[in-house]
């Protein structure tokens, strides 16, 4: 099931980071909003630790005007700890080897850029995250690759694995998502996000009915949700409107119309996750 990821040139990943540095910074800023950290002030309380001067003044004004004052005039400081784990799951099927129209880049190269940008952004914040990938050759042969695990640093070895990723075979999403969920659910963090990056719908060599694999993927999304894992699909398929909402839900996917702009769209994806 799980296979060793081959290695490439880590310097290529550093080149991606240099090329898209402003975008990586923007992604980091948005991810940071997912779980605020540090001391935050909660206002509008009836049993807080100290008086909120502004609220007290408003209450006095209401009394003088003969109106019923708002009695929630206290506040307290609360420590907010980050409580988030993220898995980026990459579709590495054969179709990712195809060139993007009017470009020298393949879908796989754009997928790699997405993984690298998310990785550097989350690394900067300090949240535990993993980058895994998958392809399939029938229901009994799922190829699952772990490029980076939660307890690993985003270091030279991880970068080499990301550069060494290859595309091949088919796309049995449901099984791969369940396995990704298995690793994600082992993390102690309360909030868990699974970001699937794909260029098409579920497919495999031993299944001729696409509806069956769509249903299986939808079931995987539902099962993960019941266990506390939020799934979001970033799809590069321009025709995904036909099926993606039924699988992932109305507000749990984003279609990238121009795949060359995938790195620029990632901040929008994480912004949607915060809503």
Map each language-model feature to its residues:
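Acidic/polar low-complexity segments with low predicted structural confidence
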Residues: 1-85
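Metal-dependent catalytic core segments for phosphate chemistry
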Residues: 82-85, 89, 94-98, 125-165
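…and closely analogous acidic/polar surface helices at protein-protein or active-site interfaces
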Residues: 96-129, 180, 214
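Von Willebrand factor
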Residues: 139-192, 234-242
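VWA/integrin I-like adhesion module and closely mimicked acidic/polar interface patches used
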Residues: 181, 200-245
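C-terminal helix of von Willebrand factor
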Residues: 250-275
């Amino acid at each position: 099931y799980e296979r060793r990821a081959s290695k490439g040139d880590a310097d290529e990943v550093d080149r991606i980071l240099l090329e898209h540095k402003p975008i990586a910074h923007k992604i980091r800023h948005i991810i940071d909003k997912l779980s605020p950290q540090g001391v935050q002030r909660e206002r509008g309380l009836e049993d807080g630790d100290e008086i909120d001067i502004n609220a007290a003044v408003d209450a006095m004004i209401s009394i003088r005007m003969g109106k019923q004052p708002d009695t929630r005039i206290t506040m307290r400081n609360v420590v907010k700890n980050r409580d988030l784990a993220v898995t980026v799951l990459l579709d590495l099927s054969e179709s990712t080897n195809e060139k993007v129209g009017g470009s020298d880049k393949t879908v796989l190269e754009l997928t790699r850029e997405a993984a690298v940008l998310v990785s550097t952004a989350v690394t900067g914040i300090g949240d535990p995250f993993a980058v895994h990938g998958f392809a399939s050759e029938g229901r009994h042969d799922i190829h699952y690759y772990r490029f980076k695990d939660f307890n690993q640093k985003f270091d030279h070895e991880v970068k080499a694995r990301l550069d060494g990723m290859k595309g091949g075979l088919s796309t049995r999403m449901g099984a791969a998502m369940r396995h990704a969920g298995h690793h994600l659910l082992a993390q102690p963090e309360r909030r868990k996000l699974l970001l699937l990056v794909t260029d098409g719908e579920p497919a495999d060599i031993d299944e001729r009915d696409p509806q069956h694999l769509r249903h299986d993927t939808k079931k995987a999304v539902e099962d993960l949700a019941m266990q506390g894992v939020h799934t979001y699909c970033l799809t590069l398929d321009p025709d995904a409107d036909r099926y993606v909402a039924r699988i992932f839900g109305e507000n749990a996917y984003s279609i990238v119309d121009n795949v060359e702009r995938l790195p620029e769209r990632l901040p929008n994806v994480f912004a949607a996750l915060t809503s």
